[in-house]
Amino acid sequence: MVTALIKGEIDAFIVFEPYPFLATEEIGEEKVNVFSEPDLYGETWNIVIMDEFNNENKGTVFKFINALVKAEQYLNENPKESLEIVAKNTGLDVDVVSGIMKKQNFGVVLNNELIGYLKEEAIWAIKQGLSSSNEIPNYIDVINREYLLEINPEAVTI
């Protein structure tokens, strides 16, 4: 996509990182307009498991969430090493990874921002006719806070 933009074959494209960063580096900030949060939307990566799996595998779920919290701590305490790990595993240059990661907010959290995003998506789905219901779910009722409350209670603000 970046090459097509440089050649003038396209006027715009919609992609995830690293391509917006690479386009800006290649073409220059003055010629590239990258729309990102809060301009368009926020992005979260959520863990979703079925109740049955959770009930049968509580130890595994706890270990998984604990590993994510430890990874977050490592990232915060070792930013240089974290960049090198991501660069090695993605094949991207450390400078590219650094430019991308500076824009990110890494955290294992349950907060009101997540609830807001879920409600916005529900409203969108209802308007698009993608939902069999016209009611926005009460997401507080379906979000399991028990593991994160045990591991890192400060991360739970909902």
Predicted regions and their residues:
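Residue-level "edge-of-site" marker
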Residues: P18, I100, N138-Y139
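Conserved C-terminal helix/tail region of periplasmic/extracytoplasmic solute-binding proteins
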Residues: I126-I158
